[in-house]
Amino acid sequence: MRIARQDIPVILAVPGATARQVGGFGALGGGDDMAAEWFSLGAGTDIAPLLEGLERDTCHAEHWGYVISGELVVTYADAPEEVVSAGDLFFWPPHHSIRVAEDAEVI
């Protein structure tokens, strides 16, 4: 199964960030489907204000991915922040936030 970037529907397009997402991109155990996402993020983008009011003012979802280009700073509620850069695979557990240090492409 494959999909080209331009064929993934845009679900959010604001200055500094474009999010693309497609559901049903593979099956998970228990009958659930996986979604695939592609983010194009501009330097200086910080999602923390969008997360205010959520539990611990952070993202509650887990994320696995790969940084194609750029650099992100990940802040965790219960751990030191870390830098994720081009070529890195990542896992972000619940209760994190990100800000973009360098223009980034992330899947």
Residue spans of the language-model regions?
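A short, N-terminal "cap"/entry segment at the start of jelly-roll beta-barrel domains
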Residues: 1-49, 55-56
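Conserved hydrophobic/aromatic beta-strand scaffold that supports enzyme active sites
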Residues: 5, 19, 36-38, 64, ...
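Ligand-binding loop in jelly-roll beta-barrel domains
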Residues: 32, 94-107
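A generic structural motif
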Residues: 44, 69-71, 79, 93-95, ...
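Short histidine-centered beta-strand/loop micro-motifs
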Residues: 48-59, 76, 99
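Short, conserved beta-strand element in jelly-roll/cupin
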Residues: 57-74
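Short acidic-glycine-tyrosine-enriched beta hairpin
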Residues: 76-96
